[in-house]
């Protein structure tokens, strides 16, 4: 009270001698942002924060979207370390990159995605720009659609899709819709529902497709299903917008993972494509990605490139150099590229092995449920089919953290904790 009283006295004295001070204090106390509400927490980051606070030695974080080794530790690829050493030895400068990014990186990215002998590359009827990882590629693509896709503002996403797809396209001014994709009854691909919904999409709309390792379900169409989807997309004159964040990381074979993209192009469908090197090179914090537009001819590609640069310039001017140099060094050095391909396969194989071990351990626990979908799904993520109330029990009783929809990151499962996970899942689902 004494302090409060003295504060009032001092304030009064200051006002008496300096009337302007009171007005200044009042001005400082007012706010421009009183109307701004607290935003909701990110669901995945919220899982990580809760995990960090848990003191249980057996705790598991199955929400994180980053690869972990079999000890549960972050993994830097040896090929990345070698590339970094080679770059450091060159003593390169830190000058700005061009607006479109590192030229050799862009060329190598297009070759990785489309195949080195692809007709599109030989004819030059494409443009690839370096972006700030996959998210940046999506945003550049969304903004390009908003400005130049004059036919429609409608973008159709698979249901469900990566959570960031909606705000990226919505904030770029596009209208979001969905088509059936995941079947919760089978924990697999709703092929019939997808075809039915795609057939009803208005002509000249945009359809977003996950090239491989669908996030969050881990459910991918088979090649024969992709063929039917491509036929329908072409027949209905839809624009195919591919998101490929996991090339090589899904099956362990980069060509296999890019099959859908290449098939669509072979069928005469001019697509656009987003790439990320976060997962398949472990360059999460380097933010390395690319955005490619396949065009009618080389002249059209030049015009599209000029407008992509105009979009990029006020957004971030030009992309960062370090990650692009790492990726480019790996992709353009035959020995490093071969080593990297083996390392990517090793990461993919570990995740596939963890899926198999989890199902095997569930059977050992005596689970009567059919867990085949865990093995059938592909990539980092798995839609387990576990219900929200069961997820809550896993967290409270076993310190196992995941998103409420039952999605787990298989990268967080190791040979040391897979048995514990299987036991916990059995306990809450029996």
UniProtKB/Swiss-Prot annotation:
Substrate binds at residues 65, 162, 215, 407. GO terms for cellular component: mitochondrial inner membrane; mitochondrial matrix; mitochondrion; plasma membrane. One of its GO terms (molecular function) is kynurenine-oxoglutarate transaminase activity. The modification N6-succinyllysine is found at residues 73, 90, 107, 122, 159, 185, 227, 296, 309, 363, 396, 404. It is an enzyme of class 2 (transferase). Its main location: mitochondrion. This is Aspartate aminotransferase, mitochondrial. Gene3D superfamilies: Aspartate Aminotransferase, domain 1, Type I PLP-dependent aspartate aminotransferase-like (Major domain). It is found in: Mitochondrion matrix; Cell membrane. It catalyses: L-aspartate + 2-oxoglutarate = oxaloacetate + L-glutamate; L-kynurenine + 2-oxoglutarate = kynurenate + L-glutamate + H2O. Its EC number is 2.6.1.1, 2.6.1.7. It holds the Pfam family Aminotran_1_2.
